[in-house]
């Protein structure tokens, strides 16, 4: 009857799918490629080396189990793999050691920038306060002045003086809030926001982060990036900055932001 024929056709299609999976797995092994079970196991081993909080570790394991149940041929599999790769590549709780040598910092600032005595004095003051109160949230410096006076390069000198990594994003002409917060991973071609991408590139969670041309931000129908930056820069909120792609809070409180 009709039910039996439907059940039989369903079983046939499942058996065919299983047979093709096994065939593909064997071909991958013959070619010397990594089978997707090995890929999952490799990710699990890498995750064991990470200094994650319990929440992050549980979330990662849950998402990894989800990937394990997926068919490697579907588009969602590669999205899920990219998502888990991002988790493994981000520098969770990995900080570089600060160098609080104020004389050395003064020499680096003098070497790279002629004049600007008042600005350099304020920067050294900030570094002195950070040295005395190590538990203090990183200050946000805002450098204001005409083009070409060395605002952006001053951020690079501060990073060198502190022994921190240096990252910079240009905010000029940015109109979409998703540039800061990222897109939800359900969208095709979704990416994390520029903040999370830059931290991945820096390799530490406490770089000197230059936000260039902050006054050139403009809002549009896609949202207001300036409002999204408030969560990035507010010391009360940035301990748990939420990126739409990451779907987890990320601690930005140790990042030293320099706006120009």
Regions found by a protein language model. Give the residues of each.
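Active-site phosphate-binding and catalytic loops of NTP-dependent enzymes
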Residues: 72-73, 92-96, 130-137, 165, ...
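Conserved alpha-helical scaffold flanking the Walker A/P-loop in AAA+ ATPase domains
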Residues: 186-211, 242-249
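Pre-Walker A (Motif I) flank of P-loop NTPase domains
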Residues: 135-141, 205-207, 255
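The Walker A (P-loop) glycine that initiates the GxxxxGKT/S ATP-binding motif of P-loop NTPases
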Residues: 143-145, 182, 213
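Walker A/P-loop
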Residues: 137-171, 200, 230, 234
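Conserved catalytic/switch belt of AAA+ P-loop NTPases
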Residues: 211-256
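Extended, charged alpha-helical coiled-coil/arm scaffolds that mediate oligomerization and mechanical coupling
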Residues: 1-133
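AAA+/P-loop NTPase substrate/partner-engagement loops
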Residues: 161-191, 198, 218
